[in-house]
Amino acid sequence: MATIHIIEDDWGVRDALIELVRGFGHRVAAYADGEAFMQAGTPLPDDVIFVDLGLPGVGGQHVIKWLKGLAQPPRVVAISGRSRGDIEAALRDLPNLPLLRKPLAAESITPYLEERGRPSRRCSP
């Protein structure tokens, strides 16, 4: 089973994403910064990584470039609440990277939770 990794420094956003992803029956690993994520070990190719571009310390762009440089990179999705200009500058060297703008909606996240071509289904509480 793939793991959904959430790298987000805002605890409220991180907690909401954890609950949403778990509600769809996925295994979740969450990190408050890029350093903690990178120290946790290399993600698997089937994993999905949601990365906030505005991380403190090791920034989201650095984490994404590291992930894209892996022999078998996982699916990566950038998230940001920054202005359009800031986002475009941050992603200039990262073409074709999916981006979700904050505030996040469940409908924008669920397509990235598909596993092996099967859509995620909401689990009953």
Residue map of PLM features:
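Acidic, metal-coordinating helix/loop segments flanking the phosphotransfer/catalytic sites
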Residues: 30-48
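Acidic catalytic/metal-coordinating carboxylates
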Residues: 33, 59-62
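Active-site residues of response regulator receiver
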Residues: 52
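Short amphipathic alpha-helix used as the core "switch/output" element in two-component signaling
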Residues: 61-72
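C-terminal output helix
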Residues: 86, 104-116, 121
